[in-house]
Amino acid sequence: MIKQRTLKNTIRATGVGLHSGEKVYLTLKPAPVDTGIVFRRADLDPVVEIPARAANVGETTMSTTLVNGDVKVDTVEHLLSAMAGLGIDNAYVELSASEVPIMDGSAGPFVFLIQSAGLEEQDAAKKFIRILREVTVEEGDKRATFLPFEGFKVSFEIDFDHPVLRNRTQSASVDFSSTSFVKEVSRARTFGFMRDIEYLRKHNLALGGSVENAIVVDEDGVLNEDGLRYEDEFVKHKILDAIGDLYLLGNSLIGEFKGFKSGHALNNQLLRKLIAETDAWEVVTFEDASTAPISYMRPVAAV
């Protein structure tokens, strides 16, 4: 049986919020079967919990924000991408502020944290959501689609009219039956343009942003001394974001996601449309792991 997974141990990290610029303490904790990923604002009394579900997404400007009443948790997508990539079904994410720390701008540090905590299999079947038919949302020239696929595949195309990006790969397709999330996707960093940063800071966004936690691009090139981690790092980061956003379904996917210029808002619209169209998906479990189409879920042996 493919079993649900949680963390073996509690693990902590400290970082800075990308948009708030605040110092944040992050604690990842094991959680019981069928808990899902639950964010907890430990700085509040009483502590406020926000399950990582599509229905709890309140804002999608520059990042994905979960809300419960007037309490929010910003920038959840990179951590959720790491949870998805390592197949973590159940965990508590405790925060000392309203934003998940940005770390280095990728999911890499979160992958390292989760692997350091260790993975533990639980005595219950892991639930997958299998896409049964096409579901699409569009907004102007932007598009996001789910398609049936025996495995998990994410295809993405960006279209930036910018001298640096025009000459780089702007599309990628990753089939996780043959590609490692950890090696090929998790280290792709978020990116921003110098021309936008002044505007963002005026609106109290990207206050914690720097070349330490983002790829910064001006008209002439990439400002980061070490350059890019992947030739197609820009579009790979959009794939990373999408994987995190899709994990708000609450389960791992069996299907294909295709995005064209899609972002957090359209990704969330797609999830809500899928959930509403109950004939477009089904929940499945696997008694025999060898019959499952998803192998990328087992990158590390769970003890």
Swiss-Prot record:
Cofactor requirement: Zn(2+)
Active site per database record: H264 (proton donor)
Reactions that this protein is recorded to catalyse: a UDP-3-O-[(3R)-3-hydroxyacyl]-N-acetyl-alpha-D-glucosamine + H2O = a UDP-3-O-[(3R)-3-hydroxyacyl]-alpha-D-glucosamine + acetate
EC number: 3.5.1.108
Gene Ontology annotations of biological process type: lipid A biosynthetic process
GO molecular function: metal ion binding; UDP-3-O-acyl-N-acetylglucosamine deacetylase activity
Listed GO CC annotations: membrane
SUPFAM superfamilies tied to this protein: Ribosomal protein S5 domain 2-like
This protein's record includes keyword Ribonucleoprotein: no
UniProt enzyme class: hydrolase
Binding positions for Zn(2+) per the UniProt entry: H78, H237, D241
Chain's role: Catalyzes the hydrolysis of UDP-3-O-myristoyl-N-acetylglucosamine to form UDP-3-O-myristoylglucosamine and acetate, the committed step in lipid A biosynthesis.
The protein's name in its UniProt record: UDP-3-O-acyl-N-acetylglucosamine deacetylase
Gene responsible for this protein: lpxC
